[in-house]
Amino acid sequence: LSAYITALTKSVQWALDLGEFYSPAQIDIAKKVLTEAERRVALLARGEEDWTRKTGLVVRGYYSSIDDSPQPYGLEIPEGFDFSKPAPLYVWLHGRGDKTTDMHFIHQRMTRQGQVAPENAIVVHPFGRHCMGFKSAGEIDVLECVQHVSEHYKIDTRRIALMGFSMGGAGAWHLGAHYADQWVAVGPGAGFAETKEYIKLQTEDYPAEYVQTLWGMYDVPNYVRNLFNLPTIAYSGELDKQIQAAQVMERAYQAEGAKLPHIIGPGM
């Protein structure tokens, strides 16, 4: 079956198996997701589909190369969008949401607009395996999600921007630094950029040396020079503790003789 269907049905099955209903009212969420899956099955049975040219909020899916599982993602496509012309793609990485598992993520993407709404552009919301910080399988899911969108829509590959806030900001930092050739610009908000300072680890509590070495996989200051190849603009709230991520990266930029553009919201 198409991942456009199985991503939906899997999400409800997992919610049942793993106890991801947090109030009786959320039974209605499962019903809405299954109703949409049933509608799509009926369309495919008639040799039809309506999601490739739909505007507004669209939920699609693809099969992961990691484990062949159906993974959902959300799209926001402006009304009156011209599907015949190459368009910019904005990749928005979501923040942490402990209860926003597959089914709840899908329902959000069916019903709730996101944080950015650029004109004449598509916004994609990767799921990224829930709350993995867009690392490991979550990292690959973002890349495969972008690839899937690019295969099914006319995307101007020179104008793919990466953005995110909180945990999504952390994902934007490390995906931006690791894959700087994939993006036209990166906009990380809040989040975290490394391990040791973020968790306030004291020297006496450091783990084994090999664990510290493994931090290097995702500690973004190690890769800061990659970010010199594209516009990278951090943004933070003045009072938000997660301003720490941008401050760490400001120091990393300074160590290389560069300056990080950093927008700070006063009193926020």
Roles of regions detected by a PLM:
Residues 1-5:
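Amphipathic, heptad-repeat alpha-helical segments
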Residues 18-87:
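A domain-start/cap signature at the N-terminus of enzymes
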Residues 79-85, 133-167, 177-183, 226:
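Gly/Ser-rich "nucleophile elbow"/oxyanion-hole loop immediately N-terminal to the catalytic nucleophile
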Residues 85-153:
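Active-site machinery of serine-nucleophile hydrolases
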Residues 97-109, 181-230:
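Mobile cap/lid helix-loop segments that gate and shape the active-site cleft of serine hydrolases
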Residues 162-164, 189, 235:
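Short beta-strand immediately N-terminal to the catalytic nucleophile in serine-hydrolase-like folds
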Residues 171-175:
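Hydrolases whose catalytic domains are alpha/beta-hydrolase-1, hotdog thioesterase
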Residues 235, 239-268:
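C-terminal catalytic histidine-bearing segment of alpha/beta-hydrolase fold enzymes
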